[in-house]
């Protein structure tokens, strides 16, 4: 049964509101500070301008990290609330029907999915929407000579087991830790990808609600190290990060967009599926459109609009792979998979459409594509080869069903990993299909 709140807003959108109810917000977005600080207001401003044809103004509510966007629609006032108090607060608001859209800088947890199961499946394509990619940047002072750390060493630093920069190749100086607060999806992501249940954050860490404030403080502290969304890196220096034996990578346009960077993460909007607010679904479609993704790029995050890159020569790449791709550019898309080994995930389903649009815009066809599947390390090399081939075939079949016939697809087994072999996170990242396009 629709809530009273949703019913009143339906009345508002029909312009039959009773006196005294005109202050109801047309939409409410609650959750991640990473999304809500800048990205969500920018996206909503663009959406409202397109919807109404009128200017949009932003004003504070009097509560920290909250913004109201105001415009008029058919002569009536229209407002949208963006409340950016952390990912977990957004789920609570969505579950309580106090929010139409939950902004999350991590994926929905199993317990959260179960709690909402009677209203919507939050992992379904109708409810789960990847809107951008962010790199969880590891920040140090610009003068710090340390260039890279592996994830285990990074975890030991944040746990306080490594407490002096000289232990990791830096100056003889104590390490000061800066971290996001407990309500933050950024913290949840760091805890999952770095601490990984093996380490606890040192009690001496300074905690922050704001990415930007954390980054600013690290950039002014020669002893400091912290983490924040890539868009909030500011004047801090970025470290390259290695996952296991995989190469260390800095967050860059290609490494983050393809999610090859070990600390790349997806930014999500969640809705109550087809039972949710229709205006929210319109907003989601706007965000996923080329116009919306251009705003994502403008905000400093990584859009999902594909672009092609000529990769420089790399001596670590096997000769067979170099010959396979010598006439191709790397596209900034990796197809990844859901629970099944060959089932494309929700982002990949959208990416199929984006790749198809890229081909149309660039005057190319499926014959110009090369899909290269990869697998995590398996019990037998032939098994990894088979899984990688099935993944490439799965992506080629999905494109063919959309009218794009891909002639070039191949499996490359467990070679060229981008994540630690054998672990859950590494397995998700290593199990991928790279997209290459003929020059």
Model regions and ranges:
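Periplasmic OmpA-like peptidoglycan-binding domain that tethers envelope proteins to the cell wall
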Residues: 364, 374-439
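Flexible loop/hinge segments at secondary-structure junctions
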Residues: 24-341, 346-350, 356-360, 425-429, ...
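Short coil/turn segments at beta-strand junctions that form active-site/ligand-binding loops
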Residues: 25, 222-223, 365-367, 405
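Conserved C-terminal helix/tail region of periplasmic/extracytoplasmic solute-binding proteins
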Residues: 357-362, 367-372
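Short loop/turn segments at strand-loop or loop-helix junctions that form parts
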Residues: 337-338, 371-376
